[in-house]
Amino acid sequence: MSFSINGKTAIVTGAANGLGLAIARQFADKGANVMCADMDEKKLEEEWGGDSEDGSVRYFAGDLRQRLTIANLVSATIDSFERVDILVNGSRQMIETNALDVEDTSVSVLLEQNLMTALHLTQHVARRMIKQGADQPEGQLGSIINLSSIAARHTRPELMGYSIASAALEQMTRSMALALASERIRVNAVAFGSVMSASLQSSVIEHSEWRDDIRAHTPLGRIASPAELTDAVQFLAAESSCFITGEVITIDG
């Protein structure tokens, strides 16, 4: 089986920075058509404005917590590339939780951003994959990859909301994998350890001790760069993983 994604069409959310940006760049470099989605239109323009003149890359700015925005993203992808083969749900947010504050809304905010956005986009994209595969009697119709975190299993008090949302995303991955298997659509997740994303950069600025703590509890003794983790996502997107679904691959050093 091949690791190639050449000629495939992918939607990558969270593609304005960090891991989502690294995944989108690798996919484009490997010959895929890529629709880069994010809420930060200015950053999308900075990262992808020049590339969007190339026929293989487009970008879409919008709040994917809104269902109409999700529908518009899928429509824009079809208008640009006529199909969608791969979805990477990479849009994530990390905020702290005060477990004893009854006014704290972080759990509901993170469930909406990190779980429900991925679920709704998965539903829309899966419906499109099924429709475009109506005349394809065999072979996979699509691959969906959710970006999770080892916080789903290993947490700390202030990350309670993020951990709950990550665990829910992983269970959604397993459930959707079962629901879509008969449609020949695979659904998997990659759970990352410490990756120097924009959100982690902000966190270690506020909590300087976190950097040393992360390094001390990571056997390889360092924080990964986004570019180190993109091959696993490409593996799950490609035919090389055609008999893998419902799995959560952990990459944590």
What spans do the regions from the language model cover?
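Conserved glycine-rich Rossmann-like NAD(P)H-binding loop of the short-chain dehydrogenase/reductase
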Residues: 30-46
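Substrate-binding pocket helix/loop in short-chain dehydrogenase/reductase
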Residues: 98-99, 103-111, 159, 214
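Active-site loop immediately N-terminal to the catalytic Tyr-X3-Lys motif
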Residues: 100, 154-160, 182-183, 221, ...
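Active-site helix of classical SDR
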Residues: 122, 165, 173
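Alpha-helical segment proximal to the catalytic Tyr-Lys
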Residues: 127, 178-182, 242
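Residue(s) in the substrate-gating loop at a strand-loop-helix junction
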Residues: 149
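C-terminal substrate-recognition "lid" of short-chain dehydrogenase/reductases
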Residues: 222-251
